[in-house]
């Protein structure tokens, strides 16, 4: 049957359409509600992590700035003052600071959280593992901001290297932090305790810095390292940062950004798989 406008007036058909519409609305509503719940979990977890740093943040910044600054000064005296060399030194130092804060510090922090049973405390709350790891990673990324800004300003105003950072630089910095934080989280959850996590992260840190084209061009590395460095995230972090602050973002840079996205997803997923709220899990 049809009404005066030519539309179907069959009650069964109308009922099916109404039910479909209600179901679709319900799915959309439940999806929004779940997203809002995850966002609240993330905010409160991040707020708690940052609250713990209220008395320690200064020394974290000093620690994360000291080694990159010393390395920058040493290489400045050793390699000369050419703009290309200085650009490698500055972006390499920022990459080192990111490794220290995002990978090394987070890995050790997670390892030491195992000892007093901190994860059992978090297990008492209705929170998801990926959100918990994302909050820990965000804390590490935030901690790396002051030291990276300091290094960038020193490069621009003391070394006189022309810097043209853009919104792409911010995107690369965030992805770099999360990709290295994912690696640190995986090591931390994989380690038996804080001491083991500390030893492993301190071994990994120089390897992913000095066996990749972080401070020197890739073609200056031994041929073997030119191949193996393709599987190290700092290769893409340093290359992308260098291109963005120099204002020379190309299709290769976007490819490296895409690889950082893949590395971030894989490492954070692997870390969430290794997270056990309780020792017997």
Stretch-by-stretch model annotation:
Residues 2-167, 171-179, 183-209, 213-236, ...:
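Hydrophobic transmembrane alpha-helices and immediately adjacent juxtamembrane helices
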